[in-house]
Amino acid sequence: MWQIVFFTLSCDLVLAAAYNNFRKSMDSIGKKQYQVQHGSCSYTFLLPEMDNCRSSSSPYVSNAVQRDAPLEYDDSVQRLQVLENIMENNTQWLMKLENYIQDNMKKEMVEIQQNAVQNQTAVMIEIGTNLLNQTAEQTRKLTDVEAQVLNQTTRLELQLLEHSLSTNKLEKQILDQTSEINKLQDKNSFLEKKVLAMEDKHIIQLQSIKEEKDQLQVLVSKQNSIIEELEKKIVTATVNNSVLQKQQHDLMETVNNLLTMMSTSNSAKDPTVAKEEQISFRDCAEVFKSGHTTNGIYTLTFPNSTEEIKAYCDMEAGGGGWTIIQRREDGSVDFQRTWKEYKVGFGNPSGEYWLGNEFVSQLTNQQRYVLKIHLKDWEGNEAYSLYEHFYLSSEELNYRIHLKGLTGTAGKISSISQPGNDFSTKDGDNDKCICKCSQMLTGGWWFDACGPSNLNGMYYPQRQNTNKFNGIKWYYWKGSGYSLKATTMMIRPADF
């Protein structure tokens, strides 16, 4: 189509150029043939000669000045007529030329149009095919893109839904946390008020304690001065006591000598008395059975030996016949003793004393004995533990204790660890602890790994007897930090 339009414009330009050349040729008088060349087209025009026109060399011209006015006018009219004829002839020739060109151009235009249409159709078909291919490719790409966009959109929608659910969950959690924070803030405010009140109370108490401390310091100062005076008096009393003890010792020797003399004289007079004195007792049960039913100190004899020992016999408790092997009541005797002292015994049988491990070991290995432990606290309460079978091993086995059959009110569990433990002292460590329990807890005892009991510990007076790990303790009655007021360990034959 564009080629046809271009050809039409080209031919119009050719005709216009031919017309312009024709006008130029008309201006040149004397030329009878005119030729127009435009591209591959060549046009030749033959025009008639102008016979009626005069040349400028006419004799009338040289005399034109001398002619009258009517002659000049007629000449002009004639010339105009000639020109009109010429113009009419030219017009006719141009019309013929135009008709000729139109007739010739129609055929050429038809051929050109047919060729152009064929060429253009092929081009258009090719272009259309390319466009269809491109359109199909673009459509396929658009379909892929659309699918990708759809998948991406779906994924984004799912993510958006997840984010929305997560956001809702977070909002709920935030609301819950906000509620918890508000509760905590309220509780914190309450606690702050309580702390402030406690601080005020604490300040008041500190002031009161400070005042009491000042008062106590004054009292301590006074007591220190009193103690110094008492120490001076004690030193004086000690000196006097030493003198009195010496005097008492001399008196005792004198009394013993007198008693010996009296016994000798009585023996000479009454032979039955000498026979009674030769009778010996193994334990207080034999003393009780012999008719002596009064509490007191009696002389006992080691089994299979003539060696004697002083012991206190309880002839009233539980039917009597009890041999006291340990007693604590006032802290007058120090129980932080050596192995040898615990072996042979120490103290005063009428007060605090330890009978001796060697005698108890030999005695309890002769026959079956029971052990009763009687306890008192500082509040006036009493309790006991009774073991149906008791004996001590020999010194070679560190006087190991053996107990069976516990009854009593001082705890359902034995405060003396079982099986039997070896005896330990400050110079004979036989316990199961690397800490040396006898040195740490004081006193000699059957320690395990320091164990739940120690009746030979440090004696503490009332109001100082709590929270004492090294006191006189029996764990399963009063706990580990309570130091008892009094204890008694006594034995008696099981068949008494």
UniProtKB/Swiss-Prot annotation:
GO CC annotation: cell projection; collagen-containing extracellular matrix; extracellular region; extracellular space
One GO molecular-function entry: signaling receptor binding
Stretches assigned to coiled coil: 166-248
SUPFAM superfamilies cross-referenced by the UniProt entry: Fibrinogen C-terminal domain-like
Pfam families: ANG-1, Fibrinogen_C
InterPro entries reported for this sequence: FIB_ANG-like, Fibrinogen-like_C, Fibrinogen_a/b/g_C_1, Fibrinogen_a/b/g_C_dom, Fibrinogen_CS
Impact noted for substituting R492Q: In LMPHM10; uncertain significance; no effect on protein abundance; severely decreased secretion
Key word Transport present: no
Binding annotation for Ca(2+): D429, D431, C433, C435
UniProt superkingdom: Eukaryota
Effect on the protein of changing T299M: In LMPHM10; uncertain significance; results in increased lymphangiogenesis; decreased interaction with ITGA5; no effect on protein abundance; no effect on secretion; no effect on interaction with TEK
Disulfide bonds: C284-C313, C433-C435, C437-C450
Sites where a glycan is attached: N89, N119, N133, N151, N240, N304
Keyword Protein biosynthesis appears in the UniProt entry: no
One of the GO biological process terms: negative regulation of positive chemotaxis
Fibrinogen C-terminal domain: residues covered: 275-495
Disease annotated for this entry: Lymphatic malformation 10: A form of primary lymphedema, a disease characterized by swelling of body parts due to developmental anomalies and functional defects of the lymphatic system. Patients with lymphedema may suffer from recurrent local infections. LMPHM10 is an autosomal dominant form characterized by the onset of swelling in the lower extremities within the first year of life. Lymphedema may also occur in the neck, upper extremities, and scrotum or labia majora. Gradual resorption generally occurs, although some patients may experience progression complicated by cellulitis.
Subunit structure of this chain's protein: Interacts with TEK/TIE2, competing for the same binding site as ANGPT1. Interacts with ITGA5. Interacts with SVEP1/polydom. Interacts with THBD; this interaction significantly inhibits the generation of activated PC and TAFIa/CPB2 by the thrombin/thrombomodulin complex.
Known role: Binds to TEK/TIE2, competing for the ANGPT1 binding site, and modulating ANGPT1 signaling. Can induce tyrosine phosphorylation of TEK/TIE2 in the absence of ANGPT1. In the absence of angiogenic inducers, such as VEGF, ANGPT2-mediated loosening of cell-matrix contacts may induce endothelial cell apoptosis with consequent vascular regression. In concert with VEGF, it may facilitate endothelial cell migration and proliferation, thus serving as a permissive angiogenic signal. Involved in the regulation of lymphangiogenesis.
The record's note on its domains: The Fibrinogen C-terminal domain mediates interaction with the TEK/TIE2 receptor.
Protein name per its UniProtKB record: Angiopoietin-2
Gene source species: Homo sapiens
Name of the coding gene: ANGPT2
